[in-house]
Amino acid sequence: MLEKFERYPLTFGPTHIEKLERLSEHLGGKVQLYAKREDCNSGLAFGGNKLRKLEYIIPDAIASNADTLVSIGGVQSNHTRMIAAVAAKIGFKCRLVQESWVPHEDAVYDRVGNILLSRIMGADVQMVDEGFDIGIRQSWEEAIEDVKAKGGKPYPIPAGASVHKYGGLGYVGFAEEVRVQEEELGFKFDYIVVCTVTGSTHAGMTVGFAKDGRERQVIGIDASFTPAQTKAQVLEIARRTAELVELGRELSSDDIVLIEDYAYPVYGVPSDETKEAIRLCARLEGMITDPVYEGKSMQGMIDLVKKGYFPEGSKVLYAHLGGAPAINGYAYTFRNG
């Protein structure tokens, strides 16, 4: 599906799939849980899902003769960390807008984790006091113009690399990769669980798995707390990506499965249930999930297993998208473990 698109390698190769044996047994053993470790996909600044997307975006950035990657996220954005890492790797400058998306108070929140790594990698970090929104932001557009005014050649990458024209391609590749791994494993996964916020990871998976009719087996767990906007954006990206890869069929709103029950109390703030899911996964599997994204999708998957959402005997693949550095911004929350 991706043969005609240029790819700039930023990852090690296919990511490992491991069985979550102890977590599966803890939840009754009737559903078999697996994780695809996108969090271990690269040596670039702790890796993560954004690199899979950026592999199809960076060739366009280089071809444009730009010299500066310009992007945006929250204070503890995993995406902006990855932009900083890739900019360093390819010899570009990096301008990052970090908005106050999360109403979280921690004495070190803006000095540790992702934003610390971005600064170490040489990014020009601009803090902006604006609330959460997955759409195009004025502060980002102003940063692009500022780079131009100073003689730079900006290459704009939106939040999460999601509404970029090539933002969905990387996770079409994820689906193709899973199909190869399923042949090696000797079975197919019945469901794929993924955290959904800006939407292109979910959208790309939907398109990729639509090739063999499994688009509705991709179960998005909303972490945005703006699910209507998020679902609309996932569908828009999926449709655009389907055209790019010549899927040959139209995707509908019904093809986007988004479960809205776990994003509370608000984007970036973990509920008690999210915190318990983070601890449970860490203590049973040694696998770290973060309070913003993967902790909420892990909470969702655990709860869905408990509720019987997945039929007995199901094999469920959890897409671990990364994000562990952000947990440093929640040091007080987890001060006692």
Curated annotation (Swiss-Prot):
Signal sequence extent? none
Spell out the molecular function terms from Gene Ontology.
1-aminocyclopropane-1-carboxylate deaminase activity; D-cysteine desulfhydrase activity; pyridoxal phosphate binding
Class in the EC hierarchy, top level: hydrolase
Its recorded reaction(s) are: 1-aminocyclopropane-1-carboxylate + H2O = 2-oxobutanoate + NH4(+)
Cofactor(s) for this protein?
pyridoxal 5'-phosphate
Keyword presence, Hydrolase: yes
Which residues does the entry assign to the active site, renumbered to this chain? S77
Q: Residue positions of the PTM N6-(pyridoxal phosphate)lysine? A: K50
EC number per UniProt: 3.5.99.7
The source's domain of life comes to Bacteria
| HAMAP family linked to this entry | ACC_deaminase (MF_00807)
Q: How does it assemble?
A: Homotrimer.
Task: Return the similarity comment.
Answer: Belongs to the ACC deaminase/D-cysteine desulfhydrase family.
- Name of this protein: 1-aminocyclopropane-1-carboxylate deaminase
Q: What is the species of this protein?
A: Rhizobium rhizogenes (strain K84 / ATCC BAA-868)
